[in-house]
């Protein structure tokens, strides 16, 4: 989250007249992330203060956004702890602010666990599987907009910034994934609405009696219909690694995948293509971070991520042995 579009106290106070949320007490920009303008919003009504998150969307359109917002509402009504969009007085959950789409959602309690252990990873795996099952009957359809077609489209824009070894790696991996995505095995993989960006900083934990309890997932604005195995691979590639090397931490990876498998059993075909999906997850974020790093947009508090992190992860996944990639331990 970042701030590309600034909003004054008077502007948000006027905008909130269309909501039944009381008076603005504080609006504070959120520095993390790089896609949208995000703010913590505090209001007061009848002597009680409440916390929300205001998001102004910088790339997504009014036509695209209902998929994400209604997915969050759908999951919230099915017991998955996610931010719930707040409707305005007219019932709409998406409105224009400073000429751009904007929404208000509930603020989840807790803090991100940036140094997760196996127990944290197991909780995330369990909720991710429950989220996938809860989304099965979500009626809206939208593909993951940062999948293979986007990687192929973006390749030409980022190749000039790469050295020869990086260009070869990028081109070969996109070709591998294109072949995989076109296979009968890929077509047979189960899927549905996916988060597609479930990193450590997109989940919150509450401390309860000395135990960190998962409080929920947020930032669904990269969500889309995709293969569930891809969503799990993206999550493992962030939560279950040594950050310095990109190497998988087996204890955390096993905990997350086994907890997921206990709720939604993985098929033999999914197990056979685990490494392909770990590679796909690494490629997706290597491409997007190269794009954000070398072709940045101006923003207050913008903090682009280092693209070499996911290059290392991709190289590590390519070097996995067949035994390590087979999920034989689930």
Curated annotation (Swiss-Prot):
Cysteines joined through disulfide linkages: none
Signal peptide: none
Protein name stated in the entry: Homoserine kinase
Key words of the record: Amino-acid biosynthesis, ATP-binding, Kinase, Nucleotide-binding, Threonine biosynthesis, Transferase
Family of this protein: Belongs to the pseudomonas-type ThrB family.
Enzyme Commission code(s) on record: 2.7.1.39
Record-linked NCBIfam families: PRK05231.1, thrB_alt
Catalytic activity annotation: L-homoserine + ATP = O-phospho-L-homoserine + ADP + H(+)
Listed pathway(s): Amino-acid biosynthesis; L-threonine biosynthesis; L-threonine from L-aspartate: step 4/5
Lineage: superkingdom: Bacteria
One term of GO molecular function: homoserine kinase activity
GO terms under biological process: threonine biosynthetic process
Keyword Secreted appears in the UniProt entry: no
Keyword Kinase: yes
PANTHER family: AMINOGLYCOSIDE PHOSPHOTRANSFERASE DOMAIN-CONTAINING PROTEIN, AMINOGLYCOSIDE PHOSPHOTRANSFERASE DOMAIN-CONTAINING PROTEIN-RELATED
